[in-house]
Amino acid sequence: MYLAELGGGTSLRAAVCSAVLDPRGPLFNDPREILEEELRRPGTYFSLLEELARGERRMESLTGALRVSHSALGPYLNELARMQLVEKRAPLTARRDMRYRLRDGFLRFWFRFVFPFQESLRAGAPLGDHYDAEIAPALADHVAPVFEGLCRRWALREMGGRVTRVGPWWGRSLDSLRATGERSGEEIDVVGSARSKVTLVGECKWTTGRMSPRALTDLEQFKLPALRQAGARFPAAGPEIALFSKSGFKDSLVDLAAGRDDIRLVDVDDVAAGLEVGQRHLEGRGVERQS
């Protein structure tokens, strides 16, 4: 629905400026009007959604930012979850260390780049300047979680029965590295499992530069050991590795992957083609899916 409002044949910058940032545009105030009709005390909800628009948050982070107690914030999160706007999820293979995230991509965009600036935009702030200063530098960071979700869906489609559950994982770094302060926490964008074993791990890069071997080194040297330390089980041969990149791969990484049977390099076109071909098949499999 929202994409249709942006229209075709124009640049993203021009479309966002006219449809979303312009106070006369169809999407400038649409989320506010809809949510104000649905929610009591919308101000508190809006503050919460603004915080979540910047990324997933633990409860402690939310209560600290909003200066409220767990018990006071809980009903607001529950109501947003009931409306399917917010969800709570744990790292795959674990049931603790829960995070909350804003599910709708446009609401994430609106509460991050429009809502905090509505007063100045109404006062006549130049739309192009706002886009260049606030949106363009953060756009890759904003889009990255969407790309990661698509990569997880791709994994379900392409890995067949070798992956029946997929999601992100986060947890503590190796105890030895935490003790020295070298590293504190690790995150893996794509973790796939089947029959209680981790069969796939993947890293996703939505950047303008090509992915380097450093991504693989970090995964194998730091992240996989941390995942094992957290109690994950692996097949005897270890998990397969998928590396996803918006901008392709450096030749050194291509050469490295060519010499190993357990590594697959996946670019944006591969992800798009896999999802387009497999969408109906995926929906009919009935597997558990986490994006």
Question: Can you describe what each PLM-predicted range is?
Answer:
Residues 1-33:
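Amphipathic alpha-helical "lid/sensor" segments that cap RecA-like P-loop NTPase cores
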Residues 30-41, 61:
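Short amphipathic alpha-helical boundary/capping segments
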Residues 42-53, 152:
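Hydrophobic residues on short alpha-helical segments
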Residues 55-65:
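Short acidic, hydrophobic short linear motifs in intrinsically disordered regions
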Residues 67-82:
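Short amphipathic alpha-helical interaction segments
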Residues 81-92:
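A short, conserved structural fragment
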Residues 92, 98, 103-291:
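A cross-kingdom feature that marks ATP-driven nucleic-acid transaction machinery
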